[in-house]
């Protein structure tokens, strides 16, 4: 699943090509995504100028002169820049055609993503209204995590993956941040000290920023806006490394199911 770094990589890649241009055509080849593409999306978007491309958690916000298109890449989605006449591949479901012979193409084999229009400020949309702070913003730190964790018995990994606590920390980066902070993923969230949460908050931001610089993580489906893979997988310390030696102590990395998600940790380094 594309996580925050992959979505941010996409945002940085597509924005220079489409910001400031008007939509001249919308082509919907398959409307059945997680939520159906609005039937009147073409009528709504045609003639509107794109003013900005933002990210909120794992959502991309395409701001037009009036209204916003909210995009989520789901489990396997991607957005790429191409020429409008470039033949669509299988699973290329939606084209946004801009002035200047530019096309933003939405590709999603599993169709778990979405493209939704809102005329209101997107921050009020039900998908975004309850999101926690951005993990790369100054408003997010370990004190925020410690405050929300008080009295909670849920596993800390599930806690930091709750988008109401912090927006956009997915499975890959939760595993990696907890390893760097030396915290066992199953430890109850309410039984972790402020000092350890401060350390964890720093590592969450650190691992996300490092992945963005590497263009994201390629595991199965993710490629960036140009079709190139991300490279952060090459430096993953625990994720997808079950049975391999810990890069710090040599102990074999273990994998368990936690909250129905594959969870990787070092039994020696993480307590």
From Swiss-Prot:
DNA binds at residues 91, 110, 152. Its EC number is 3.2.2.23, 4.2.99.18. Signal peptide: none annotated. Pfam families: Fapy_DNA_glyco (PF01149), H2TH (PF06831), zf-FPG_IleRS (PF06827). The active site is at 2 (schiff-base intermediate with dna), 3 (proton donor), 58 (proton donor), 261 (proton donor). Involved in base excision repair of DNA damaged by oxidation or by mutagenic agents. Acts as a DNA glycosylase that recognizes and removes damaged bases. Has a preference for oxidized purines, such as 7,8-dihydro-8-oxoguanine (8-oxoG). Has AP (apurinic/apyrimidinic) lyase activity and introduces nicks in the DNA strand. Cleaves the DNA backbone by beta-delta elimination to generate a single-strand break at the site of the removed base with both 3'- and 5'-phosphates. This is Formamidopyrimidine-DNA glycosylase. It comes from Methylococcus capsulatus (strain ATCC 33009 / NCIMB 11132 / Bath). One of its GO terms (biological process) is base-excision repair.
């Amino acid at each position: 699943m594309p996580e925050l770094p992959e979505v941010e990589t996409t945002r940085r890649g597509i924005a220079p090509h489409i910001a400031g241009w008007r939509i001249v055509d919308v082509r919907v080849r398959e409307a059945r995504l997680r939520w159906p593409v609005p039937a009147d999306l073409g009528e709504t978007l045609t003639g509107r100028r794109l003013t900005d491309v933002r990210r909120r958690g794992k959502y991309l916000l395409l701001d037009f002169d009036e209204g916003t298109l909210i995009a989520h890449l789901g489990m396997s989605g991607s957005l790429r820049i191409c020429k409008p006449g470039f033949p669509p591949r299988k699973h290329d479901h939606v084209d946004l055609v801009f002035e200047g012979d530019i096309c933003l193409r939405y590709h999603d084999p599993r169709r778990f993503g979405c493209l939704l229009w809102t005329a209101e400020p997107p921050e009020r949309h039900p998908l975004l209204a309850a999101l926690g702070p951005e993990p790369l913003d100054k408003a997010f730190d370990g004190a925020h995590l410690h405050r929300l964790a008080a009295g909670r018995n849920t596993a800390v990994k599930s806690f930091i993956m709750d988008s109401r606590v912090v927006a956009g920390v997915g499975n890959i980066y939760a595993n990696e941040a907890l390893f760097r902070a030396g915290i066992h993923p199953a430890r109850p969230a309410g039984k972790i000290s402020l000092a350890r949460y401060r350390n964890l908050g720093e590592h969450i931001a650190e691992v996300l920023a490092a992945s963005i610089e590497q263009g994201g993580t390629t595991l199965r489906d993710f490629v960036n806006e140009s079709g190139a893979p991300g490279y952060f997988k090459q430096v993953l310390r625990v994720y997808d490394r079950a049975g391999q030696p810990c890069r710090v102590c040599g102990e074999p990395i273990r994998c368990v199911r936690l909250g129905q998600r594959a969870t990787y940790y070092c039994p020696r380094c993480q307590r």
